[in-house]
C-alpha cells in the first residue's frame, strides 16, 4: 500500500494531541499505525545515572527510575542508539524539578519543566549526571512517544424521518467524529447527543467502510504530527524490507 492509496484529513490538532481520519485502509493497517506509534518510533530517555551526591530521603535506584520516566524532547536527526548527557544540581530547601535538568545539547530538554523529582530539606542536595539514549517503546515503555493512541470507525449519520409525536426524548449518545454531508463533525460540538444535533428526527448510524478516526496524544518528546509521520515511515520501511526478502 503506497501513500497515494489512502487519504488523511485532520479534525483538530496541536503539538501534543490530534484527531485525524484515514480513509481507504483496512482494520489491520489501522492497527499497524497504532502499534507503530507506540513501539516503533525511537525517543530519548534517561538510561544511566551517575550520582555525585544524594543526601535526600530517596535511594539512588528510585530516583533513577523517576528520571527515566521524564519525557525528553527528541530532535529529528537523532538515530537509534545515539546518546546525550544531562546534569542536575539542586540544593534544599526546595524541590528538584525536571526543568532543572541541563543538557549538553540545547535541543534536548525535559518536555515538561514542572515534573517533581524529589523534595529536598535543609542541607540536602542532589547532584548527578545522566545519559539519555535513543530507544524504542517495544523495548521499554519509557520510550513510548505516544501516551494514548486509539482509533475507531468513522460513522455516518442519515436522517430517515421525523420522530413519532409522543416518542421519548431520551438522549442518543455518540462519541467521536461523524461524517455529515461529506464534512467531519466532532460529536463534542453538540455534547455527544444526536438528539441535540437532529431534534425531532429519527437517524440511522453506519460505519464508513475503510475509514478510521485516530486520536493520538504525544508525551512531548516530539510534536504529534511528527510522531505519526515517523510511525508511517517505519511501516513503509518494513514493507520494503519484506519485499526485498521475498525477492531473494
From Swiss-Prot:
The reaction(s) this protein catalyses: RNA(n) + a ribonucleoside 5'-triphosphate = RNA(n+1) + diphosphate
GO MF annotations, alphabetized: DNA binding; DNA-directed RNA polymerase activity; protein dimerization activity
Major site of localization recorded for this protein: cytoplasm
EC number(s) per entry: 2.7.7.6
Biological process, per Gene Ontology: DNA-templated transcription
Record GO cellular component, one term: cytoplasm
Record flagged with keyword Manganese: no
Keywords assigned: Cytoplasm, DNA-directed RNA polymerase, Nucleotidyltransferase, Transcription, Transferase
Function: DNA-dependent RNA polymerase (RNAP) catalyzes the transcription of DNA into RNA using the four ribonucleoside triphosphates as substrates.
Family: Belongs to the archaeal Rpo3/eukaryotic RPB3 RNA polymerase subunit family.
Subunit structure: Part of the RNA polymerase complex.
Name of the protein described by the UniProt record: DNA-directed RNA polymerase subunit Rpo3
Record organism: Halobacterium salinarum (strain ATCC 700922 / JCM 11081 / NRC-1) (Halobacterium halobium)
Lineage of producing organism: Archaea, Methanobacteriati, Methanobacteriota, Stenosarchaea group, Halobacteria
Amino acid at each position: 500500500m503506497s501513500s497515494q492509496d489512502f487519504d488523511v484529513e485532520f479534525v483538530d490538532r496541536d503539538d501534543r494531541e490530534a484527531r485525524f481520519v484515514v480513509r481507504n485502509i483496512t482494520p489491520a493497517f489501522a492497527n499497524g499505525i497504532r502499534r507503530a506509534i507506540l513501539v516503533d518510533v525511537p525517543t530519548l530517555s534517561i538510561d544511566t545515572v551517575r550520582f555525585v551526591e544524594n543526601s535526600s530521603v530517596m535511594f539512588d535506584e528510585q530516583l533513577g527510575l523517576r528520571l527515566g520516566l521524564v519525557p525528553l524532547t527528541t530532535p529529528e536527526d537523532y538515530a537509534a542508539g545515539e546518546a546525550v548527557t544531562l546534569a542536575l544540581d539542586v540544593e534544599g530547601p526546595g524541590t528538584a524539578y525536571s526543568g532543572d535538568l541541563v543538557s549538553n545539547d540545547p535541543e534536548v530538554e525535559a518536555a515538561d519543566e514542572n515534573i517533581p523529582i524529589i523534595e529536598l530539606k535543609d542541607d540536602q542536595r542532589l547532584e548527578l549526571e545522566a545519559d539519555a539514549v535513543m530507544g524504542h517503546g517495544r523495548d521499554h515503555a519509557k520510550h513510548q512517544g505516544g501516551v494514548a493512541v486509539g482509533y475507531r470507525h468513522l460513522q455516518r449519520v442519515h436522517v430517515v424521518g421525523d420522530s413519532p409525536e409522543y416518542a421519548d426524548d431520551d438522549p442518543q449518545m455518540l462519541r467521536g467524529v461523524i461524517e455529515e454531508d461529506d464534512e467531519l463533525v466532532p460529536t463534542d460540538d453538540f455534547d455527544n447527543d444526536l438528539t441535540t444535533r437532529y431534534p425531532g428526527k429519527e437517524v440511522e448510524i453506519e460505519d464508513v467502510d475503510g475509514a478510521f478516526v485516530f486520536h493520538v496524544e504525544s508525551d512531548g518528546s516530539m510534536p504529534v504530527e511528527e510522531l505519526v509521520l515517523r510511525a508511517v515511515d517505519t511501516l513503509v520501511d518494513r514493507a520494503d524490507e519484506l519485499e526485498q526478502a521475498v525477492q531473494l
